[in-house]
Amino acid sequence: MLLHIPNVLNAEQLRLVRERLDQAGDAWVDGRATAGYQGAPVKRNQQIAEHTPVARELGDVILASIERNPLFISAVLPNQVYPPLFNRYEGGMQFGSHVDGAVRVLPNGVKLRTDVSVTLFISDPADYDGGELVIEDTYGVQQVKLPAGDMIVYPATSLHQVTPVTRGARIASFFWVQSLVRSDTQRAMLFDMDTAIQRLNASHADDTARRSLVGIYHNLLRTWSET
């Protein structure tokens, strides 16, 4: 399931993030440092070094925002979230086709299974040319270039790439989530069911039917979830 989540960061948060990243200086390093065996040969970008003060500060801003975002919670069903990273593409930089690594190691040494990949756009689309996130999924090839503050979530199993940036700079945050439900198909069904329940709540539909659907949702989540 590929899902666009709008307005994850507000204007004030975007201003703060951009200001801190503009001032990051030597914290920007070669992005190949975090790429795996498959990704390193096709990756040309810059990243904020992991575990630096600016990475932790801005990562906390993003984590606080997604924890309050009901659409993100419903669609992703997060169990563990990898600390957000930040990248920059400019001057022809790109990231060729690749699939994200299956496992990342959290700062505390705990391993995280990458079920869901997340990109949060920090630059406005008008500020750069190129830089589309191209995702190949079961419905074909999707090109993604969203307003600043908006997020795209998609299965980490997807083949994807970032096209060359030919003007300006494309700055974004990216990270991975281990979901309570590892199957994308099952997560999508639960998301559709939760969306239907919310619509029933808003329409004041038959309460017995609504309670029944809520019960089915939680029983499926209980059956499929891993904690």
Curated annotation (Swiss-Prot):
Gene3D superfamilies: q2cbj1_9rhob like domain, Rabenosyn, Rab binding domain. It is an enzyme of class 1 (oxidoreductase). The keyword Transmembrane does not apply. Its EC number is 1.14.11.-. Its cofactor is Fe(2+); L-ascorbate. It holds the Pfam family PKHD_C. One of its GO terms (biological process) is intracellular iron ion homeostasis. The keyword NADP does not apply. Keywords: Dioxygenase, Iron, Metal-binding, Oxidoreductase, Vitamin C. It comes from the Bacteria. SUPFAM superfamilies: Clavaminate synthase-like (SSF51197). Residues 80-179 form the Fe2OG dioxygenase domain. GO terms for molecular function: 2-oxoglutarate-dependent dioxygenase activity; iron ion binding; L-ascorbic acid binding. Binds 1 Fe(2+) ion per subunit. 2-oxoglutarate binds at residue 170. InterPro entries: Oxoglu/Fe-dep_dioxygenase_dom, PKHD_C, PKHD_hydroxylase, Pro_4_hyd_alph, Pro_4_hyd_alph_FE2OG_OXY. Fe cation binds at residues 98, 100, 160. This is PKHD-type hydroxylase Bphyt_7102. It comes from Paraburkholderia phytofirmans (strain DSM 17436 / LMG 22146 / PsJN) (Burkholderia phytofirmans).
